Amino acid sequence: MKITAEMIKELRQQTHAGMIACKQALEKTEGNLQKAIVFLREKGIVKASQKQDRTTSEGLINIVFSQNDAFLYELNSETDFVAKNEHFQQLMKTIGEVILQNKLQSVDEVLTFNYQNKTIQDLLLEKTSILGEKITLKRILKVTKKEEEIFGTYKHQGGRISVLVVLENNHPSIAEDIAMHIAAFNPKFLNPDKVNLQFLTTEKNILQKQTEKQLLEEKKPLHILDKIVQNRLNKLLKEICLSEQPFVKNNEQKVKDYLQNNNTNVVSYFRWSIANQ
């Protein structure tokens, strides 16, 4: 497969690796971007965290509520300047009202919904014409909780990052604290038991290759490989699992201990950042 300049540029944007390294990675993986990223990580050229929060557009994420239902939705613009414009802000509010009042759960449902004798898609096109930038509704998610549970939310930078938490018991301030923590620490999983098996396998393979390379370079015995890999994997899990992270308001206490002390637990959480799935 021919490796193009655009493919190299995209890989460099996501990894910050050098041009030659990106070209070699793409050649080794036959142009597969995700496999090329893993290849660079195995070689120790790039870390996983470097691509996590890159944004491809601007906009805002909002959360609206109706009793036991919450709806997250993301509206994109091309620049931050337009996202702060009153026309964009009003459109954001209108879409939230339409979603909430009609319990709409997909982008298609919203775009085809008739609002004041026009569809929401028509409204987006109107705002695109007024603002001079393409305005798009990217995604929607409905979250339903039980009666005894509670929602907690936190918005960073007005909605560039928005977090929704479902907590077991009715503790509003605790739910908000956990949502703020998630916005800041960006955990990938709720706890070690919830870690995706494919993710775990991929990370372990990468750590094995990195560690083996390091041991060979340092002329150390390979029989210690498995122990080092497991220790590094355990450290990674502590960093990416919500329950194991140091609590944002007290770094001497883990999140799971904070929750246990307050007799509650996190049922689920959703952290959205602009233009990232």
UniProtKB/Swiss-Prot annotation:
Segments forming a coiled coil: none
Stored PROSITE patterns: EF_TS_2
Region annotation Involved in Mg(2+) ion dislocation from EF-Tu: where it falls in the sequence: 79-82
GO terms, molecular function: translation elongation factor activity
Recorded superkingdom: Bacteria
Pfam families reported for this sequence: EF_TS
InterPro entries attached to this UniProt entry: EF-Ts_dimer_sf, Transl_elong_EFTs/EF1B, Transl_elong_EFTs/EF1B_dimer, Transl_elong_Ts_CS, UBA-like_sf
One term under GO cellular component: cytoplasm
Keyword line: Cytoplasm, Elongation factor, Protein biosynthesis
Compartments reported by the entry: Cytoplasm
Function: Associates with the EF-Tu.GDP complex and induces the exchange of GDP to GTP. It remains bound to the aminoacyl-tRNA.EF-Tu.GTP complex up to the GTP hydrolysis stage on the ribosome.
Family: Belongs to the EF-Ts family.
This protein's name: Elongation factor Ts
Source organism: Phytoplasma australiense
Organismal lineage: Bacteria, Bacillati, Mycoplasmatota, Mollicutes, Acholeplasmatales
